[in-house]
Amino acid sequence: MVDDRTQLLLVARTAYRRNDWRTSYESFSLVDGVQTLDTDDLAVYASAAWRQGHGRESVRINEQVHTRLLRTDPVLAAMKAAELGLAWLARGHLALARNWAQRAQGLLDGVPEAAAHGYLAYLFAVTAADAGDREQFGSATRQLAAIAESLDDAALVALARALAGTAAVAAGDPAGYQTLDEVLTPVLDEPVPVEWAADVYRRALSLAHRQNADDRVRSWAQSMQRWCDATEPESTQSAYRAVCDVHRLSAVTDTDPRDLVRQVVSLRRLVADVDAVAAGMVEELLSRSVGRAR
């Protein structure tokens, strides 16, 4: 039995490295059912679960990672808390996202300025944006920009510029589109961690969709596709790719309704539990396609 577990762990880790999310997730799930995974394996398991569209399970696993990190590294625990807040926010749970942001803040109080403070500032900014709190959004955005400059951190600089661009577009300033173009095209800079880069893309695409800026939806969806190809080479299916495809299809007007239904139905499972906005768009696309097919 020990040999079987060892072999399954090897399969899970190897599959993850080659971006075979399904095999990795299923193998980790089998091992997790019979033995305790170490913290690094748990984190990878959570990531594979998210990419397979299992958002609720991914959050549950990452909460275990957070609990373990509390005992060993408060700064890493704070970073994990911020990631959890971002995940809950993507899934449409603003109150829980705020709760995790506050946990992260408590862990970072008194800690010398580090990148984790910047990611937390981003989380506070986007939760404020989703809550319609302009004052807190502005404060958190300025804080992020200051930390990015102080640390000379390229990833945080990209996040700060993305927030500035989305804020400008939302306020009706067309210069915001140019700022976002500079951040996102041809592709978002590689130093930005996957979870945070994905949030930038989903926010920019959702904003362009709300503004009926179909040219930007197409351009930024192409950028996200290139980003997926760079971060998930050889992977043909993942939640991130599905979110990208949902936005891409939302800007297509000449697709056969029946073909569109087939494509959207295949995407529904992957986005339903990881991105509330994309999940809503899936239902809109299905409703529109069914109506056109009649």
What is the predicted function of each stretch?
Residues 11-17, 40-55, 78-94, 116-133, ...:
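Tandem amphipathic alpha-helical repeat scaffolds
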